Amino acid sequence: MTNKIILALEAEQMTKEIPTFAPGDTIVVQVKVKEGDRARLQAFEGVVIAKRNRGVNSAFTVRKISNGVGVERTFQTYSPQIDSMAVKRRGDVRKAKLYYLRDLSGKAARIKEKLS
């Protein structure tokens, strides 16, 4: 049984509004980046290849191709470093973890769009 105090603290930290997204979706994550004394927002757009739902410990992994090189970044869902998230495109996939996309390139790595 989880302690009521821990549950209350976790509920307090999970107040951020998160859009519903799933593996296969293309999302844009606005990340707060601090360079020296000034802060700015950096957009990271890519396909969600994994999602982990564990309350305040939830995380998701986004993959994009930058200059012909695959770049993956794992974000903590309720991190204060994330300013905002937006779903650009819904993907139609049948798996929860899309790690097989790491081995594919070009047209083979495309994901069908979900028709709804």
UniProtKB/Swiss-Prot annotation:
It holds the Pfam family Ribosomal_L19. The keyword Transmembrane helix does not apply. Keywords: Ribonucleoprotein, Ribosomal protein. One of its GO terms (biological process) is translation. GO terms for cellular component: cytosolic large ribosomal subunit. The keyword Ribosomal protein applies. It comes from the Bacteria. One of its GO terms (molecular function) is structural constituent of ribosome. PANTHER family: LARGE RIBOSOMAL SUBUNIT PROTEIN BL19M (PTHR15680:SF9), RIBOSOMAL PROTEIN L19 (PTHR15680). Belongs to the bacterial ribosomal protein bL19 family. This protein is located at the 30S-50S ribosomal subunit interface and may play a role in the structure and function of the aminoacyl-tRNA binding site. This is Large ribosomal subunit protein bL19. It comes from Pseudomonas syringae pv. tomato (strain ATCC BAA-871 / DC3000). The gene is rplS.
